[in-house]
């Protein structure tokens, strides 16, 4: 019966190849003869029932390669676990380092915002107070101007009354001069009358009294006396009326002057008080202006400081986000590498299972008598193989327990 060859394909693990069986290889009743290539990464043919020294070395190399693959898989799994642990530690450390507690900063910002709001409210209250003070100052200024106008009117009235008083004084002096002249004239008339009476008495002397039945003579003395009494009464009445009128006018003027003086003093005291109030309000206004300027400066400094702090925090957040993106990229890359390694592991396990199945199937087909195999016929060419390789006629095939001890 012709011998049937079983071609096998083997490639390095880096190429992620699989071992497969050709469809032309069929099981045989004879002891198999095989052709195995000793070069790595090329096609090898394993024929049933044929083993030589090169084949043993090849099996040893395959065993070593499988052991190296398994060791490499375990090492890669170990390194992968270590890398995952390191990544987790670094991620947790960076999260703890790059995400500090900003609650204190937020609390400080809220407190400063409350202070700013309170300061704004205080500024508004101060502005309202200043406006009220300005309105009060305007009212006081209006009152002052009104009182000043009244004072000027009162002073004008007082000056007019003083002119009237001067005129009355002049009229009084004229009337007194007239009274004196009338008194002198009356005295002159009296002296003249007495002189005339004396002259008439001297002229009559011892003359006889001739009584004539006629109308009674006019008593000039009595008439003059009556006229004098009338004039004196008129003069006294006029003098008394003038004095009363003058006294009344003087009393009224004195009252007006006293009232005006009191009002003037009260106005002067009010003006002094208003000036003091205006000075106090101006001082308070300047103090409020300085306080407002200082508060505005403090507010500007606070806003600038917190703006810089917020910009720094924003830069920190940007850096943290960039680091997180880098970490995510690293994690994705390592995840891809891990998936590739898992794929390599799965392929290696599949390849190992294939080798194990091949070895077990060959072990079940090979007999335990090592040197009882006759010479085999030349191998027929198989599909998919470019050339036919023949093995020697006498081959010593190891038994199944020997192969199992190797693997």
Curated annotation (Swiss-Prot):
Swiss-Prot/TrEMBL site (Stutter) positions: 304
Domain IF rod residue range list: 55-366
Region (Coil 1A): 56-90
Residues spanning the signal sequence: none
GO molecular function: structural molecule activity
UniProt-listed Pfam families: Filament
Residue ranges of the region described as Tail: 363-407
Annotated tissue distribution: Cuticle of the hair shaft.
GO cellular component, one term: intermediate filament
Region of interest: Coil 1B: 102-202
Domain of life: Eukaryota
InterPro entries with a match to the protein in the record: IF_conserved, IF_rod_dom, Keratin_I
Chain residue ranges for the region called Coil 2: 219-362
Matching SMART domains: Filament (SM01391)
Annotated stretches, region: Linker 12: 203-218
Renumbered residue ranges of the record's region Head: 1-55
Keywords from the named record: Coiled coil, Intermediate filament, Keratin
Ranges where the record places region Linker 1: 91-101
Note: There are two types of hair/microfibrillar keratin, I (acidic) and II (neutral to basic).
Family under the similarity heading: Belongs to the intermediate filament family.
Protein name per its UniProtKB record: Keratin, type I cuticular Ha2
The species this protein was found in: Mus musculus
């Amino acid at each position: 019966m012709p011998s049937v060859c079983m071609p096998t394909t083997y490639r390095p693990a880096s190429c992620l190849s699989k071992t497969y069986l050709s469809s032309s290889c069929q099981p045989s009743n004879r002891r198999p003869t095989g052709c195995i290539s000793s070069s790595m990464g090329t096609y090898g043919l394993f024929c049933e029932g044929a083993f030589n020294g090169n084949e043993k070395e090849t099996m040893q190399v395959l065993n070593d390669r499988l052991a190296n693959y398994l060791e490499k898989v375990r090492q890669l799994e170990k390194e992968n676990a270590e890398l995952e642990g390191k990544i987790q530690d670094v991620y947790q450390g960076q999260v703890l380092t790059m995400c500090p507690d900003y609650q204190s900063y937020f609390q400080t910002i809220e407190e400063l915002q409350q202070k700013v709001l309170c300061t704004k409210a205080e500024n508004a209250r101060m502005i309202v107070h200043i406006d009220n003070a300005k309105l009060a100052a305007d009212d006081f200024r209006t009152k002052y101007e009104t009182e000043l106008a009244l004072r000027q009117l009162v002073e004008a009235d007082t000056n007019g009354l003083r002119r009237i008083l001067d005129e009355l004084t002049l009229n009084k002096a004229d009337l007194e001069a007239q009274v004196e002249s009338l008194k002198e004239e009356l005295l002159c008339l009296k002296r003249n009358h007495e002189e005339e009476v004396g002259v008439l008495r001297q002229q009559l002397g011892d003359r006889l009294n001739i009584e004539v039945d006629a109308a009674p003579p006019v008593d000039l003395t009595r008439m003059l006396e009556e006229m004098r009494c009338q004039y004196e009464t008129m003069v006294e009445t006029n003098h008394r009326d003038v004095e009363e009128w003058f006294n009344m006018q003087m009393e009224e003027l004195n009252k007006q002057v006293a009232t005006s003086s009191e009002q003037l003093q009260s106005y002067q005291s009010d003006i002094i008080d208003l000036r003091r109030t205006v000075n106090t309000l101006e001082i308070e206004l300047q103090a409020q202006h300085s306080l407002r300027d200082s508060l505005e400066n403090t507010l500007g400094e606070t806003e600038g400081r917190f703006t810089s702090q917020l910009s720094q925090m924003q830069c920190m957040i940007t850096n943290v986000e960039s680091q997180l993106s880098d970490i995510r990229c690293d994690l994705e890359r390592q995840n891809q590498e891990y998936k590739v390694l898992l794929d390599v592991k799965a392929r290696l396990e599949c390849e190992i299972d294939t080798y194990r199945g091949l070895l077990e199937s060959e072990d079940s087909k090979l007999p335990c008598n090592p040197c009882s195999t006759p010479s085999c016929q030349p191998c027929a060419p198989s599909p998919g193989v470019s050339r036919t390789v023949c093995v020697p006629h006498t081959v010593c095939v190891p038994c199944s327990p020997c192969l199992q001890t190797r693997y």
